[in-house]
């Protein structure tokens, strides 16, 4: 599974309240959530992401309260994948279950810059950027099967058919 796109870069400790503020949690429409993704940190995020982007971030991306809407908002906004130095565990699983690939890469914010175009091999974790190949942690097994299906619901439909 290959994912490619230009980079939007953010720092450490981007929590779910930044990814999708609590005032929007009463809504379930992915298109609505997308318009408010990352709004407190980057009011232009939706416009930038709508072209299809890869987020690069620092440590503990997705920390804070567990909200599936965070993964839904990012994916619906046009985020193709997230590369970070580390992820909050429940956020990581929410993203996999919603079909959004996450790659852990030590020193991601030092290795990749805003505007770079990255090509990610989700299975191996290899990230090609500016002629260099970086080695992140790939996704394998059932998590990869879920991603390839487009999310947990699609995966369950496929395996129960």
Swiss-Prot record:
It is an enzyme of class 4 (lyase). Pathway: Amino-acid biosynthesis; L-leucine biosynthesis; L-leucine from 3-methyl-2-oxobutanoate: step 2/4. Its EC number is 4.2.1.33. Keywords: Amino-acid biosynthesis, Branched-chain amino acid biosynthesis, Leucine biosynthesis, Lyase. It comes from the Archaea. InterPro entries: Aconitase/3IPM_dehydase_swvl (IPR015928), AconitaseA/IPMdHydase_ssu_swvl (IPR000573), IPMI_Swivel (IPR033940), LeuD (IPR050075), LeuD_type2/HacB/DmdB (IPR011827). It catalyses: (2R,3S)-3-isopropylmalate = (2S)-2-isopropylmalate. GO terms for molecular function: 3-isopropylmalate dehydratase activity. GO terms for biological process: L-leucine biosynthetic process. Belongs to the LeuD family. LeuD type 2 subfamily. Heterodimer of LeuC and LeuD. Catalyzes the isomerization between 2-isopropylmalate and 3-isopropylmalate, via the formation of 2-isopropylmaleate. This is 3-isopropylmalate dehydratase small subunit. It comes from Metallosphaera sedula (strain ATCC 51363 / DSM 5348 / JCM 9185 / NBRC 15509 / TH2). The lineage of its organism: Archaea, Thermoproteota, Thermoprotei, Sulfolobales, Sulfolobaceae.
């Amino acid at each position: 599974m290959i994912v490619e796109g230009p980079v939007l870069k953010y720092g450490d400790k981007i929590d779910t309240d930044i990814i999708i503020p609590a005032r929007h949690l009463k809504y379930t429409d992915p298109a609505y959530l997308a318009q408010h993704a990352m709004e407190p940190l980057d009011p232009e995020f939706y416009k930038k992401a709508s072209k299809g982007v890869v987020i690069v971030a620092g440590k503990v991306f997705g920390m804070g309260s567990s909200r599936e809407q965070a993964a839904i908002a990012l994916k619906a906004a046009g985020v193709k994948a997230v590369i970070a130095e580390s992820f909050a565990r429940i956020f990581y699983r929410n993203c996999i279950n919603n079909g959004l690939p996450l790659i852990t890469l030590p020193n991601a914010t030092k290795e990749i810059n805003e505007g770079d175009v990255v090509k990610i091999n989700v299975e191996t974790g290899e990230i090609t950027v500016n002629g260099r190949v970086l080695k992140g942690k790939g996704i394998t097994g059932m998590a990869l099967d879920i991603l390839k299906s487009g999310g947990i619901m699609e995966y369950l439909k496929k395996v129960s058919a």
